[in-house]
Amino acid sequence: ACPQKRGVCTRVYTTTPKKPNSALRKVCKVRLTNGFEVISYIGGEGHNLQEHSVVLIRGGRVKDLPGVRYHTVRGTLDTAGVKDRKQARSKYGAKRPK
């Protein structure tokens, strides 16, 4: 397979995790370049994705969201990095703060 894959967001929405957790998790439906349509999780606080955004996705499921088997990669293509992120920055596409 591929380590990452490019795709276009067809729907950006929130879902609720399964018990015993409770939250509004940000996810997006992505139509990949190979024609697959998958659901991808958007990690980090806040995001700028909307319909027709071009995103890069990587593997990695979200254990409390059924059917979500991919993560969007922050800080590439149309996905902005997380603002004011101080720790674990490379995972969220944040530059080193001055």
Swiss-Prot record:
Family named by the database record: Belongs to the universal ribosomal protein uS12 family.
Modified residues (3-methylthioaspartic acid): 64
A cellular component term, taken from the record's GO annotations: small ribosomal subunit
Region (Disordered): 79-98
Residues in coiled coil: none
PANTHER family: 30S RIBOSOMAL PROTEIN S12 FAMILY MEMBER
Gene that encodes the chain: rpsL
Single GO term (MF): rRNA binding
Domain of life: Bacteria
Protein purpose: With S4 and S5 plays an important role in translational accuracy. Interacts with and stabilizes bases of the 16S rRNA that are involved in tRNA selection in the A site and with the mRNA backbone. Located at the interface of the 30S and 50S subunits, it traverses the body of the 30S subunit contacting proteins on the other side and probably holding the rRNA structure together. The combined cluster of proteins S8, S12 and S17 appears to hold together the shoulder and platform of the 30S subunit.
Subunit record text: Part of the 30S ribosomal subunit. Contacts proteins S8 and S17. May interact with IF1 in the 30S initiation complex.
Protein name from the UniProt record: Small ribosomal subunit protein uS12
CDD domains: Ribosomal_S12
Annotated organism of origin: Eikenella corrodens
Compositionally biased region (Basic residues): 88-98
